[in-house]
């Protein structure tokens, strides 16, 4: 990339900072949740919605981001994304109640949903095709550093300042990013087809209402009749989308995607698999802080080995899948992740804290292998004319399943916690133990889906071609 013009390199730096802000924010909040609960006068069992409100908003808004960038221009949308994300961060820091914080996180999510896909689109437009991979490697590197720094930085800020600072640090970075975007980034536009607003609204209502119904079943004031009504509305919205998308060339996601068996299996497995694995980044720091008295900073440090294991495994996952095949790798890593989850719980309950970093490192390795395999299995056999639509649907499903996973984790904590009157340390650990056992069972379930994957090892060379689009 040394032969690129200075202006292009500056534009890549802008995109890289956007990736960093978005990836940092997805992990920095986790270690601060118990402190937020105490400050806002809420039960820690309700704080999962701080994560869900952000991730669910990202899932809902993702389908519109690419169309908006083509229609309005990448500079205008990227600038808007940074401004919304920064304003959301400010409102998060100023929040005095949980409801205010949830609304601010949703505003952040609107910005976050546009930041990464529009950033990818920007790189495609400003960099020659032969240098695209090198440019994407450059701009995504800060996105890999964000999860590494996020938990420890969040714990450090909470312990030595306050939880408000995990949002305030976004403001100067966002201001600089917004100004440089206006000054340096060209406003590329493309001719677009008419946006499928009806399909977008049906999907948005279906996802949001079903997630709300799932969370409402935890005893948050919804009556059984209201929950049943929400479920009915959500199901009807999704069924209407399926009817709307039939033989509709303008549909957000073509139903032709599901004619490819590996896409259908991969998408179903990704949805079920990320529900289970999406619980872990939320539950682990909460488990360590509330169950065992770890400080926020110490709990954040414990997350670093998991990220390191994930990053290290990415270098050899292609060789592993090509050697053993998708079916064996996905079944083994799914069951392995369930076992590692039980190992983490057992190690913590026995008080072997010095072993926890090694267990978390192993968990990161297994999880990374499964993620990469799920992504590439889903996309590898799609025809070129459906690859972009399939990738967008996979991205949306990834965010949606993570929000459902965090919601279910909060539901399990509330369910087991409500069965105990006392709040001594032994009871708290018992509640977490039952929750962890349930999580391990949920994590193992997608193995039944992956067992149906064709044993086509000779086709696994496609992983090297599709991996870039699935990141």
Swiss-Prot record:
Residue spans, topological domain Cytoplasmic: 33-48, 98-101, 159-164, 218-224, 284-285, 363-395, 452-471
Membrane topology: Multi-pass membrane protein
GO CC terms in record: plasma membrane
Keyword terms, alphabetized: Cell inner membrane, Cell membrane, Membrane, Transmembrane, Transmembrane helix, Transport
Residue intervals passing through the bilayer: 12-32, 49-69, 77-97, 102-124, 138-158, 165-185, 197-217, 225-245, 263-283, 286-306, 342-362, 396-416, 431-451
Residues exposed to the Periplasmic side: 1-11, 70-76, 125-137, 186-196, 246-262, 307-341, 417-430
Organism: Escherichia coli O6:H1 (strain CFT073 / ATCC 700928 / UPEC)
Keyword Transferase: no
HAMAP family membership: MFS_MdtD
Pfam families assigned: MFS_1
Family, similarity comment: Belongs to the major facilitator superfamily. TCR/Tet family.
Primary site of residence: membrane
Annotated compartments: Cell inner membrane
Keyword Aminoacyl-tRNA synthetase set for record: no
Entries under Gene3D superfamilies matching the protein: MFS general substrate transporter like domains (1.20.1250.20), Multidrug resistance protein D (1.20.1720.10)
Top-rank lineage group of the source organism: Bacteria
GO molecular function, one term: transmembrane transporter activity
Gene name per UniProt: mdtD
Name of the protein described by the UniProt record: Putative multidrug resistance protein MdtD
